[in-house]
């Protein structure tokens, strides 16, 4: 067996395979199907300072080779997470990471401060694709100023590993990654969903209640792969790649492009065991290519 271990900030992971937020619940939901302790890291669903009801239905739509979602970060808030969910998941033998969202910088900071006190949560992932309600609704992650302000504020309040999840809905994602790195991010993950929409031609109405939503799945992979390659060349912190990873081969491609770890999202809805299959597939690939460690393929793309 090859050495699959990777480091993301202070996180020492047993392998580079993680689950994407919003596609794996709190991990416990999958425990009847697979050995979830084999996964390198589980990123739980988005958590906000206060309870959120989410968007009205319909808020999901299937598309060719993908899906659209506009769930709207439905969750019961960070206090509920700390008091009711954390006690259930804290002893799962893998890294449990919390995805943090907010509608103002102080929301991110307060949420991060609360999670910082949870001993067995070693990292957070900042979702900066959220609209800043104090700045006319523009997402934090679409300008270097917005990225810098939220990352810097959270970094000052949060002492563990800080992962920043980047939006692809920008002109230059490498600039956003550099801004995150300059303001204290330990790692960047990309890509978040692409903005898309679906229309019911007979009704002449949008399918989603919000009109637009986030697109994920196999169709976005070439875009995600290109962005990971660009960002990996632009920063000196570990890059976590995601977007359309449906099998082990996709995962290997992201690592060749420069990702130190990968996240599996939409594929979890299709095959609950996909994470385990990808872990085994990466190991088989390394052995076939005579690699003793997964580090040998990170950024090994020959251009």
UniProtKB/Swiss-Prot annotation:
Gene3D superfamilies: Aldolase class I (3.20.20.70). PROSITE patterns: DHODEHASE_1, DHODEHASE_2. Its EC number is 1.3.1.14. It is found in: Cytoplasm. Catalyzes the conversion of dihydroorotate to orotate with NAD(+) as electron acceptor. Belongs to the dihydroorotate dehydrogenase family. Type 1 subfamily. This is Dihydroorotate dehydrogenase B (NAD(+)), catalytic subunit. The lineage of its organism: Bacteria, Pseudomonadati, Bacteroidota, Bacteroidia, Bacteroidales.
């Amino acid at each position: 067996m090859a050495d699959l271990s990777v480091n993301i900030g202070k996180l020492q992971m047993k392998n580079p395979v993680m689950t994407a937020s919003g596609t794996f619940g709190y991990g416990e939901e999958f425990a009847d199907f697979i050995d979830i302790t084999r996964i390198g890291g589980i990123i739980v669903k988005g958590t906000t300072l206060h309870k959120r009801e989410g968007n009205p239905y319909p808020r999901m739509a299937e598309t060719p080779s993908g899906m659209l979602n506009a769930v709207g970060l439905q969750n019961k808030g960070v206090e509920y997470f700390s008091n009711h969910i954390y006690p259930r998941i804290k002893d799962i033998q893998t890294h449990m990471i919390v995805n943090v969202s907010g509608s103002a910088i102080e929301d991110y900071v307060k949420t991060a401060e609360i999670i910082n006190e949870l001993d067995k949560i070693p990292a957070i992932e900042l979702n900066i694709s959220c609209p800043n309600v104090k700045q006319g609704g523009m997402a934090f992650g679409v300008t270097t100023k917005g990225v810098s302000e939220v990352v810097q504020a959270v970094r000052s309040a949060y002492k563990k590993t800080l992962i920043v999840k980047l939006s692809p809905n920008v002109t230059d994602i490498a600039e956003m990654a550099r801004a995150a790195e300059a303001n204290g991010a330990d790692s960047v993950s990309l890509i978040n969903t692409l903005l898309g929409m679906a229309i019911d031609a007979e009704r002449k109405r949008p399918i989603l209640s919000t009109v637009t939503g986030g697109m994920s799945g196999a169709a976005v992979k070439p875009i995600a792969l290109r962005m990971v390659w660009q960002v990996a060349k632009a920063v000196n912190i570990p890059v976590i790649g995601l977007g359309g990873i449906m099998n082990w081969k996709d995962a290997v491609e992201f690592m060749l492009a420069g990702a130190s770890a990968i996240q599996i999202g939409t594929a979890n809805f299709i095959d609950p065991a996909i994470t385990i299959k990808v872990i085994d597939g990466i190991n088989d690939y390394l052995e076939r290519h005579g690699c003793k460690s997964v580090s040998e393929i990170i950024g090994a793309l020959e251009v």
